[in-house]
């Protein structure tokens, strides 16, 4: 075989016992989960802001970022539900490049999956411990979510994974909101089919076990733009796109219709400064049409301590993205206050 086994990894229960949540942390997360659930069921009119670096590459800088986020969150908590975006595993278009802290706890060193699963659990716990903000991550590898399923308050399934059956079936067993992104083609039917699958019960194999799920009523959509056959970006955050999605939802028998608008990726063409303008347009659309307001539950923003991006090297600047370019902190802080004022 062409697969070499380096070593076995500890099962999730072992890692959870070694790096447990305290009773206080469990209580904080439980309360946050209730508040977030109420937003997606329509019982609360707070606006969700999923915000953070493209990739969580360093525990100290990520925690510094989320501590700053906490100060803003405390001031706008009557309007916004801020969920730190702490993404620890990254899909790569060609399979090459930095794949996240799960693979490389130190971007300068060789991949180490054992160190990686420990590092990402410790970082998510530290974020919760220091700030009281439970975080979001991407479910890139369905079987790996069991290492974090007691910590996360939100998960996203990316554009390259959304058609995969194991992702859809695993999402059906989650008890937190899970966002299904439109695929890179921009096909909204694929995204909605994923939501249908995730909201229904299933019977399948998971981590070597025969399992059944009850369906996830909080599964919803994420608009992130697409790319056409010529490689040109196709944004889908405009008013007419939101109306189209509303109409498509109306034709489906789905619980809790909702969308999060990802204002980077193909919606911005990775022009990170455009995120500010796109957020403003989304909020304008919400305020213009009550149906759009009810549907659009929040936005997703890529932001870090410093703006832009950098290549991995021996002299990297802490707090600057090593994957996609991000907004810097000053712009992020202003944007969050602006969202709270307009939403």
Tell me what each language-model feature is:
Residues 48-61, 324:
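Conserved phosphate/anionic-ligand binding catalytic regions in large, soluble enzymes, centered on
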Residues 40-43, 70-77, 125-130, 213, ...:
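Acidic (Asp/Glu)-rich catalytic clusters
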Residues 1-41:
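N- or domain-start disorder-to-order transition segments that initiate the globular core
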Residues 25-42, 72-83, 89, 120:
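N-terminal beta-rich core of secreted/periplasmic extracellular enzymes
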Residues 52, 261, 328:
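Conserved, mostly hydrophobic/aromatic
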Residues 304-343:
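Internal helix-turn-beta structural module
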Residues 11-20, 213-230, 316, 320:
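Gly-rich Lys/Arg/Thr-decorated short loops/hinges at beta-loop-alpha junctions or inter-strand turns
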Residues 66, 79-244, 265-266, 270, ...:
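Active-site-facing alpha/beta catalytic cores
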């Amino acid at each position: 075989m062409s697969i070499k086994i380096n070593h076995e990894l500890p099962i999730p229960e072992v890692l959870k016992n070694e790096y447990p949540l305290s009773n206080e942390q469990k209580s904080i997360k439980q309360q946050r989960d209730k508040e977030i659930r109420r937003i997606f069921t329509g019982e609360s009119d707070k606006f969700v802001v999923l915000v953070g670096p493209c990739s969580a590459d360093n525990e100290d800088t990520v925690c510094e970022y989320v501590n700053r986020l906490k100060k803003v969150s405390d001031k706008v908590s009557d309007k916004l539900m801020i969920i730190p975006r702490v993404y620890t595993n990254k899909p790569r278009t060609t399979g090459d490049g930095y794949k996240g802290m799960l693979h490389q706890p130190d971007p300068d060193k060789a991949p180490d999956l054992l160190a990686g699963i420990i590092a990402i659990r410790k970082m998510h716990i530290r974020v919760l411990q220091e700030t009281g903000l439970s975080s979001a991550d991407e479910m890139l590898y369905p079987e790996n979510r069991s290492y974090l399923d007691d910590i996360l308050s939100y998960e996203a399934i990316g554009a390259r994974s959304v058609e995969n059956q194991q992702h859809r079936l695993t999402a059906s067993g989650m008890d937190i909101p899970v966002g299904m992104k439109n695929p890179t083609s921009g096909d909204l039917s694929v995204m909605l089919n994923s939501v249908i699958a995730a909201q229904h019960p299933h019977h399948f194999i998971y981590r070597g076990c025969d399992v059944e799920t009850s369906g996830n009523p909080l599964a919803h959509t994420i608009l992130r733009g697409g790319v056409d056959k010529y490689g040109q970006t196709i944004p889908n955050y405009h008013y007419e796109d939101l109306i189209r999605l509303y109409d498509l939802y109306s034709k489906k028998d789905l619980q809790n219709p909702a969308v999060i608008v990802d204002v980077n990726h193909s919606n911005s063409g990775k022009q990170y400064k455009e995120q500010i303008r796109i957020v403003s347009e989304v909020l304008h659309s919400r305020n213009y049409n009550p149906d759009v307001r009810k549907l659009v539950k929040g936005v997703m923003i890529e932001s870090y301590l410093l703006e832009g991006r950098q290549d991995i090297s021996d002299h990297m600047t802490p707090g600057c993205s090593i994957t996609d370019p991000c907004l810097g902190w000053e712009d992020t802080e202003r944007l969050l206050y602006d969202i709270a004022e307009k939403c």
